[in-house]
Design a protein with these regions (language model features):
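Secretory/organelle targeting and membrane-embedding segments
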Residues: 1-175
């Protein structure tokens, strides 16, 4: 599934939110990426798609929690070429419960803090009902890919998808 949604709020007016989800994608991850506005001028002499990328703030929700701030910085050397670098904030807790352990533990203890309230569920279904009834044809994609090519076209005007690169906690790089 890939779609663009807008939040009906003065604070988020005109800001697109791109959502992508699927089965058997290249990587299992849950991330929120906030792309900042690109500078009004080209800062470095390099060319290519990475040269035009804006800075961003990435929140990795799973498989581990982490935050990364990405900025284009000058690559070491005489050439005035930029590199995208991420500064990571990790909160490694060796005895931390997995999300399912915590959820089940809270359910058994009667703690409803991690569970969605009824009014929030109804609001979510009000949005999803429209998606389900006004759906587009299903687009097939190759297992192990990032999804159908049509999903890429949805965000081309805003610079394309930022695919999850690696697990920020362990540093395991995705291929």
């Amino acid at each position: 599934m890939c779609l663009t949604v807008f939040i009906d709020s003065w604070r988020w007016a005109g800001v697109p939110w791109y959502l992508r989800s699927g089965k058997c994608l290249t990587e299992t991850a849950a991330e929120i990426l906030i792309q900042l506005k690109a500078p009004p001028q080209k800062l470095f002499e390099d060319a290519g798609p990475e040269a035009c990328r804006a800075n961003y703030l990435r929140f990795q929700l799973s498989p581990h929690s982490a935050i990364a701030l990405a900025a284009r910085v000058k690559r070491a050397g005489e050439e005035y070429v930029g590199d995208q670098k991420e500064l990571y904030l990790l909160n490694a807790q060796p005895d931390e419960q997995t999300p399912y352990e915590r959820l089940l533990g809270d359910a058994l203890a009667g703690n409803g803090a991690l569970f969605t309230r009824q009014d929030a569920v109804e609001s979510a279904w009000a949005v999803l009902d429209r998606v389900l009834t006004e759906h587009q044809p299903v687009r097939l994609y190759k297992p192990g890919s990032w999804g159908p090519m049509e999903a890429d076209a949805l965000v081309t005007a805003d610079g394309g998808w930022y695919n999850p690169k690696h697990d920020l906690m362990t540093g395991a790089v995705s291929l």
